[in-house]
Regions:
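Polybasic (Lys/Arg-rich)
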Residues: 1, 146-167
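Acidic-basic catalytic patches of nuclease active cores, encompassing PD-(D/E)XK
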Residues: 1-68
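Catalytic cores of nucleic-acid endonucleases
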Residues: 95-148
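Conserved catalytic cores of phosphodiester-cleaving nucleases, focusing on short active-site segments
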Residues: 76-95, 112
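Short, charge-rich binding segments
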Residues: 67-68, 78-80, 118-120
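Beta-rich catalytic cores
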Residues: 72
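Generic, well-ordered alpha-helical segments
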Residues: 68-69, 104
Length: 167
């Protein structure tokens, strides 16, 4: 079944957003980011000319610089038109949806938003959790919808549904 809303977003170049601790090398192609996060090739529909920020790399650098434990954050920040951004957490290695808890995702959301230093960019109230197609069955979609009914900003999608939001 999946999402029916296609072409909802247009990816924008992330070079103008300021992120605490970000370097130019943190801007990567979505295909590469997805592959590094464990997305299988047959489901990885994005191209490397579609750019995003690999927040894991930023968080690793911040923790080393500050001599602290690495904070939980989203894996990916995608700039979209009109100075907005989306966050996504890649869970391609996840085999069970029963492990998702609101109290685990909220700190990732807050940490990710807090390292965005650009006042002119605003969060688009969409935190996507990306899963393999075989894990996100209709039964599992219903379970997640029920579990997260109090928080509609969390959206559980497979890579095809996520890709369709942009194409």
């Amino acid at each position: 079944m999946g999402l029916t809303m296609e072409n909802k977003y247009k990816i924008d170049n992330p070079k103008n957003i300021r992120i605490e601790g970000m370097q130019d090398t943190d801007i990567k192609g979505l295909h590469t980011i997805f592959k590094n996060e464990g997305c299988i090739d047959s489901e990885n529909l994005f191209a490397d000319n579609e750019k995003a920020i690999a927040l894991d790399d930023v968080q690793t650098r911040l923790s080393k610089r500050n001599h602290t434990d690495k904070k939980a954050s989203a894996d990916i920040l995608i700039c979209i038109v009109k100075n907005k951004y989306l966050l996504a957490d890649a869970k391609f290695r996840q085999e069970n949806v029963k492990n998702f808890k609101l109290q685990d995702l909220n700190p990732k959301l807050n940490c990710s938003k807090n390292i965005v230093l650009s006042d002119e960019f605003r969060f688009d109230n969409a935190f996507y959790v990306l899963l393999k197609k075989k894990i996100l069955s209709e039964t599992n979609r219903r379970y997640l919808k029920q579990q997260f009914k109090s928080s509609p900003l969390y959206r559980f999608v497979n890579t095809e549904d996520f890709w369709n939001l942009f194409h």
